[in-house]
Amino acid sequence: MMLTVEKMQVNNYFSDNAPIIGWRDQDVEAVKLVQPWKPEALEHDQWPPDYKAVYAWRIKQLAILRSNPELLRSAKLYYSTRPDEFIMHWMDTYNPRKKTGKWMPFVFFERQDEMVKFLKDLVDNGNSGLVEKCRDAGATWCSCAYSVWSLIFIADDAIGWGSRKQDLVDKLGNPDSIFEKMRLILKRMPDVFLPQYEATFMRIINRENGSVIMGEAGDNIGRGGRTSMYFKDESAHYERPEKIEAALGDNTNTQIDISSVNGLGNVFHRRREAGVEWQPGKEIEKGFTQVFVIDWRDHPEKTQEWYDTRKAKYEREGMLHVFAQEVDRN
């Protein structure tokens, strides 16, 4: 039997979460008649998620949490050790290529869920990691979402972000930049989980628990103070990576390189070759960089037909070397 979401709850959700009002009227109406679905990581044959069903679940849950402060406190305690669930339950992600519904609940496919668990394992064990990724797999979005979770739930935490150019770290209004991603995630989060925070250029501060996310660019990476973890975005493409390594060495316990490949012999490649590939549930080996690979085959929407069509296009245009780097990780 089809469950419905109370009209009052729907109206409250859209009034309390103003950015979602941008939905078309027919989308809002459709949510009222949807079977709520509690989001979880999906396998290939389960993809894509029913995003309206996720919003329907959120609406019902928010109505319960707002009416029961003790239950809300319990929910916050539960989520404080489960970043993957908090992200899927309450964060949104963005795809500008879609004609409509560009914002959607951040429901993971399996490899994304494993990546968030990988990040938490690194922090819990004080190890460094490396993410070798193909393009368009959501690795940066997953890392931004994890950073926001940590900002909210880990008191007095300090997370660093760096990339080779300042505009890649933060550019107001550009969701391709790292800090704009995180500002947008916070902007779209329900008020019951949202702390009092301040978001300025390359810095986000949680005023309630003292946690901070800070950004740096180019040769300045690693020179802004100590952090619990530091994300180096597209680190295979840095101009002077050894200089950055020297700065970061004593400033963080957990350094995370996230990048597509960029040839042989650079710091990213050497670290990748010397590392140990991480596996879910396997004890992390101390002293080795933990390696996490996201391949195009991990993405449910990247089929063999997609691969063949994309490769043929690059071949016609004389760009197979770019395809090999960005898709094949070669």
Regions found by a protein language model. Name each.
Residues 2-330:
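Phosphate/NTP-binding elements of NTP-utilizing enzymes
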